[in-house]
């Protein structure tokens, strides 16, 4: 994969699919050049491998590094999925399947954008127009005078015994004077200008070596460096008890830190960092744990409390990596751009000069965040209303602070959970977040860890849970646990996983692979995932995870085998159950949501897992197409009956249904571009389409069970998911190569959608529907019916376990293009109320049709909906509900609120006290043992400081 391309991310993001890489040969004329000169690069390409044997359409993707080591894209690249024609290579000829192509730059400086600093290096690769196939990275030095160190390898660490002679050799393009230095002291000076260096150096000490080549004609200097170190035995010692893999702080001693890394097949590991001037030294050679020899550890002492230090591990084979369990990572590729336009990350530590690759940050005695909410009562899984958002596109400021400033907007919508697209350290700063390199660290692009904690804290103060989307199916090539065991054909420090990599498959074991595929059967991978889950739950108090691409958690299939990947796989079932247990071990009430979109039989294995304990995994339930068919006005494919959990074979409400997600086209966009249009009624009209989105909410949000909304659906967001930054639309299937799916999208706030009257009316309607849904116990039921498929859907919801008078709800909608008389089939006659405004109707016949305008809806209840103040009073009252009734298997699952200092008492039907139980929290779920109770009816009484609640229990 493209290392420096990941580093830039200035204009584009790599689409999340595998990119085929082909090795090509090349030459440049002249061989050495200044930035003011013209050059011609010749490429020899296997045209069959690139798929261009007939089209000969290949393009240059280029970037440069200036004298300040700042990277920048070539201005004529275009986007990764749609190359600029300016960068098209000139086809010369073909022979034996190998095509010869050239590209001429009039001047190197102008081609790379006339950068203000002199160019140090230029880089390029050859690609197809849509980026599906690419060459390796090609890197060239700029300047007529060049010096190449041929031995040892530049930047290498050479561990040898004392007295070993190393031949230091190199060549220059022009006559030069050479000086070799050890720890800054010259040990060799050439007697005359020459183009070759050959000096035998006897190693007697650890030394930082420099070879300085000075152009005899003009004094231009080129310096190359490497390190020599005397070998010493690796000490074996038991790792201290306070340490584990990663960075461990000793609460009793803020002047030291423990570092430990799992490094099988590595002969030794050094720690290099700001505390030892980044030098390889015997004093920083890590020890082997006596119990686990593959675990290396070292204590760093003499640190100043609260001072920031940076470090890397350097393995015996010269690979430098940050700690995979870093909580803060500094990047030479991404960090220069974080605070360019705003102070997104105040006091961002500077990347250490002279280093390369990511580095870890350590800081002892760092002040802890003072949480306002320490024991958040999560909304019940069955009542979750999840708001999925991408920080990058939600506000114009794209920061945690800007999200904090919008809490009132979210709270007023009545949602009770936000689901953030991945915020773990990803490559670049402009991304959906699924290109994760460091799963343990928070990405810096949106702000500091403290500000992220504040966002979570504020959400909890407002009754909103926080769920993180997490991509544990894969990791990018920047990941330390990928780079430590890699095949590096270019010697640039990046490459694909090697056969001995303990974490990754060399070839993916499923057909949806992106980046590097984790081997989830590996004990090393399982430990890594376990630690990642623990970090986010304990450190940030997140309420759960949405697991991305769970179809990839198998070892049973081949990379291109769709059929196998989509079938039931027992190893995948077992692996993910194991991970669920890990997550629940840290927080038994933690939400687990899988994006699987697989067979019902496999999904039911997780949805029904430990359901008797009130657990069970929630499964993404895509209902985009049927709901969109309704909103557009087409009856074909409009049946959304699978919005019901039981249609999937789940025993409880564990289907997180959605009409929109980050991955699906926006309903409003399709309404406006493809909606039905007939005389007198046009779905493509904005006002008409916005009204239909109200009806969509009525037959979507009222269905019992968890639901998910994609950001700004409540405002009728109508920009295509394929909208480009310039406002055009480029899809995966249109004639323009590539697509703009991953491009940044405008914020609805920036478009003033939130102040537009028609859109605000839609928002208010959604908020009202959600208020009815969440304040009425009638919706906390498993007894409901969904009828759809004819553009006049009907929902029938019933709950006789609630103490509220509202026990029946009937929802009707008309998605046709004309007024319809819809038979309500009320369950009984009498007074029925439109819950949107509590207007009363006297129903004398349950089958008398209700006249509903096109795009309209009605939500009827047998009793009034609670007014807001009544709902608030209800929320402050004691409540007690059995989540499963009748009860069996010796356990009663209950849910209660306002139970501070409360106790439960179970009575039989005659009023005899059977047992008492002290509740463990103020609000939440609890399981009570009823072993020994005979079949029959009982009462459970909850008594607390706020009052008393009673529920009827039937034991089978």
Q: Where in this protein do the model-derived segments appear?
A:
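Conserved alpha/beta catalytic core and glycan-binding cleft of carbohydrate-active enzymes
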Residues: 541, 574-718, 722, 774, ...
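C-terminal beta-strand-rich structural cap/linker in extracellular carbohydrate-active enzymes
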Residues: 844-867, 936
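Short, compositionally biased P/S/T/A/G/V-rich stretches that sit at domain boundaries
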Residues: 21-34, 141-161, 873-884
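Residue-level detector of functionally pivotal "anchor" positions at catalytic/ligand-binding pockets or at interdomain
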Residues: 150, 783, 787-789, 862-883, ...
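C-terminal outer-membrane/trafficking sorting elements
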Residues: 16, 871-956
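Basic K/R-rich, polyanion-interacting modules in nucleoproteins and related proteins
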Residues: 228-269, 322-383
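Substrate-binding/active-site clefts of carbohydrate-active enzymes
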Residues: 330-331, 336, 367-544, 549-568, ...
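Aromatic-rich carbohydrate-binding modules that target alpha-glucans
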Residues: 57-113, 188, 250-253, 258-306, ...
């Amino acid at each position: 994969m493209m290392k420096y391309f990941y580093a830039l991310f200035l204009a584009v993001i790599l689409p999340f699919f595998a990119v085929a890489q082909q090795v090509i040969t090349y030459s440049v004329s002249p061989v050495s050049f200044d930035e003011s000169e013209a050059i011609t690069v010749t490429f020899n390409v296997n045209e069959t491998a690139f798929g261009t044997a007939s089209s000969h359409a290949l393009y240059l993707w280029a970037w440069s590094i200036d004298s300040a080591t700042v990277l920048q894209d070539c201005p004529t690249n275009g986007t990764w999925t749609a190359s600029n024609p300016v960068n098209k290579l000139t086809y010369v000829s073909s022979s034996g399947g190998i095509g010869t192509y050239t590209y001429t730059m009039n001047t190197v400086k102008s081609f790379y954008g006339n950068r203000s600093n002199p160019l140090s290096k230029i880089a390029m690769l050859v690609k197809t127009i849509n980026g599906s196939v690419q060459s390796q990275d090609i890197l060239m030095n700029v300047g007529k005078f060049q010096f190449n160190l041929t031995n040892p390898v530049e930047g290498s660490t050479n561990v040898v015994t004392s007295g070993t002679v190393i031949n230091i050799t190199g060549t220059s393009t022009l006559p030069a004077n050479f000086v070799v230095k050890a720890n800054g002291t010259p040990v060799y000076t050439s007697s005359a200008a020459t183009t070759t260096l050959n000096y035998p150096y006897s190693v007697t000490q650890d030394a930082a070596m420099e070879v300085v080549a000075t152009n005899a004609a003009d004094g231009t200097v080129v310096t190359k460096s490497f390190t020599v170190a005397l070998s010493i035995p690796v000490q074996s010692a038991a790792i201290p008890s306070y340490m584990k893999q990663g960075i461990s702080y000793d609460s009793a001693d803020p002047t030291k830190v423990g570092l430990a890394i799992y490094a099988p097949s590595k002969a030794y590991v050094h720690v290099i960092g700001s505390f030892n001037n980044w030098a390889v030294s015997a004093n920083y050679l890590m020890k082997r744990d006596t119990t686990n020899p593959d675990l290396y550890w070292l204590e760093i002492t003499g640190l100043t409390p609260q001072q920031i230090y940076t470090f890397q591990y350097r393995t015996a084979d010269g690979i430098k990596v940050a700690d995979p369990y870093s909580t803060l990572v500094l990047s030479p590729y991404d960090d220069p751009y974080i605070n360019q336009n705003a102070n997104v990350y105040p006091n961002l530590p500077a990347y250490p000069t002279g280093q390369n690759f990511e580095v870890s940050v350590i800081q002892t005695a760092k002040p802890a965040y003072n949480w306002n909410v320490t024991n958040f009562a999560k909304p019940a899984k069955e009542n979750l209303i999840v708001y999925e958002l991408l920080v990058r596109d939600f506000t114009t400021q794209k920061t945690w602070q800007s999200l904090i400033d919008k809490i009132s907007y979210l709270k007023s919508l009545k949602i009770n959970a936000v689901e953030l697209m991945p915020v773990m350290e990803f490559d670049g700063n402009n991304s959906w977040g699924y290109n994760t390199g460091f799963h343990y660290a928070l990405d810096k692009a949106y702000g500091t860890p403290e500000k992220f904690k504040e966002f979570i804290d504020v959400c909890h103060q407002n009754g909103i849970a926080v769920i993180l989307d997490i991509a544990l199916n894969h990791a990018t090539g920047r990941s330390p646990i990928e780079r430590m065991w890699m095949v590096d054909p270019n010697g640039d420090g990046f490459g694909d996983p090697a056969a001995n990599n303990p974490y990754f498959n060399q070839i993916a074991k499923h057909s949806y692979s992106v980046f590097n595929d984790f081997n989830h059967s590996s004990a090393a991978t399982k430990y890594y995932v376990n630690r990642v889950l623990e970090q986010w739950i304990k450190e940030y108090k997140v309420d759960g995870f949405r697991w991305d691409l769970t179809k990839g958690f198998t070892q049973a299939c081949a990379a291109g085998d769709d059929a196998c990947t989509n079938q039931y796989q027992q190893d995948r079932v077992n692996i993910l159950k194991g991970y669920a247990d890990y997550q629940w071990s840290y927080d038994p009430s933690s939400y687990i949501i899988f994006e699987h979109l697989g067979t019902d039989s496999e999904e039911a294995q997780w949805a029904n897992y430990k359901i008797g304990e009130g657990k069970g995994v929630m499964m993404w339930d895509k209902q985009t197409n049927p709901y969109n068919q309704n909103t557009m006005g087409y009856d074909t494919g409009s049946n959304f009956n699978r919005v019901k959990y039981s249609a999937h074979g789940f025993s409880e409400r564990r289907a997180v249904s959605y009409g929109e997600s980050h991955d699906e086209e926006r309903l409003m966009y399709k309404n406006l571009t493809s909606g039905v249009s007939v005389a007198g009624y046009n779905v493509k009209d904005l006002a008409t389409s916005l009204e239909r989105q109200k009806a969509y909410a009525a037959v979507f949000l009222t269905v019992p069970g968890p639901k998910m909304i994609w950001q700004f659906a409540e405002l009728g967001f109508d920009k295509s998911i394929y909208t480009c930054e310039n406002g055009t639309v480029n899809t995966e299937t249109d004639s323009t190569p590539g697509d703009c799916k991953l491009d940044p999208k405008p914020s609805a706030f920036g478009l003033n959608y939130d102040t537009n009257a028609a859109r605000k009316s839609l928002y208010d309607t959604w908020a009202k529907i959600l208020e009815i849904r969440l304040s009425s116990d009638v919706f906390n039921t498993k007894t409901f019916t969904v009828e759809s498929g004819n553009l006049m859907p009907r929902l029938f919801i019933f709950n006789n376990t609630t103490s509220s008078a509202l026990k029946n709800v009937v929802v009707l909608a008309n998605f046709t293009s004309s007024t319809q008389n819809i038979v309500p089939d009320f369950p009984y006659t009498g007074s029925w109320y439109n819950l949107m405004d509590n207007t009363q109707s006297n129903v004398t016949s349950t089958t008398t049709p209700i006249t509903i305008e096109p795009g309209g809806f009605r939500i009827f209840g047998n009793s009034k909906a609670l007014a807001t103040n009544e709902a608030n009073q209800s929320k402050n009252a004691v409540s007690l509900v059995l989540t499963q009734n009748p009860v069996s298997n010796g356990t009663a699952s209950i849910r209660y609120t306002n139970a501070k200092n409360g106790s439960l008492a179970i009575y039989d039907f005659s009023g005899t006290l059977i047992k008492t139980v002290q509740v463990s929290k103020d609000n939440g779920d609890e399981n009570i043992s009823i072993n020994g109770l005979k079949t029959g009816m009982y009462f459970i009484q909850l008594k607390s400081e706020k009052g008393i609640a009673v529920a009827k229990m039937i034991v089978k």
